[in-house]
A protein has these predicted regions:
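Ligand-binding loop in jelly-roll beta-barrel domains
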Residues: 93-96, 104-134
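Short, surface-exposed loop and linker segments with low hydrophobicity and enrichment for Pro/Ser/Thr
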Residues: 68-78, 113-116
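A short, N-terminal "cap"/entry segment at the start of jelly-roll beta-barrel domains
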Residues: 1-54, 138, 148-157
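Short, conserved beta-strand element in jelly-roll/cupin
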Residues: 61-64, 73-88, 93, 123-125
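Short, charged low-complexity intrinsically disordered segments located at boundaries
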Residues: 91, 110-112, 150-154
Length: 157
């Protein structure tokens, strides 16, 4: 039936990739979670086989207006693209079309969504994307546990 959304788990995607060599999906089919502490809404998928830690990881995330995420880092290189809205990162305002490129283990932040919120696409070089706290941050705004529960590699749950 046209328009009907079918949920695709990482395992479903992996099985189809192995069988056919490619898969067509959507953000709606992948599904999203909302981080309780911040209201951030996010979805994720892996480029390549979801079970491989070496597969690049893509997140699409919406940060509500004025949402603040503490300074942190990641254990892999990444890039963030501002799709809609504005975001202040380490004191610099970013706008739609801006691209931020970051190296592993180099801290940044805080991230503060603009008054209209912000939607971003973040591409991590591999599966080592979970945020790592730095400085005085306690991790409460990162939602790492919730993200790992939902978006860890296929077969790890």
């Amino acid at each position: 039936m046209a328009g009907e959304i079918t949920h695709q788990s990482p395992e479903d995607i992996e099985n189809e990739l192995v069988r056919r060599g490619h898969v067509v999906t959507s953000w709606d089919s992948i599904g999203e979670i909302t981080i309780e502490a911040t209201g951030v809404e996010t979805s994720s998928y892996r480029i390549g086989l979801p079970s491989l830690e070496s597969s690049p990881t893509v997140f699409k995330a919406y940060f509500p207006p004025d949402c603040r995420i503490e300074a942190h880092t990641h254990a892999c290189d990444y890039s963030e693209i501002i799709l809609e809205g504005t975001q202040k990162v380490s004191g610099k305002w970013l706008y739609p079309g801006d691209i931020r490129i970051g190296l592993a283990n180099r801290g940044y932040g805080p991230l503060i969504a603009g008054p209209e919120g912000v939607t971003v696409l973040v591409i991590f070089a591999d599966g080592h994307w979970p945020a790592v706290t730095i400085g005085a941050g306690d991790g409460s705004t990162l939602g790492t546990g919730e993200l790992l529960d939902r978006f860890s590699a296929a077969g790890e749950n």
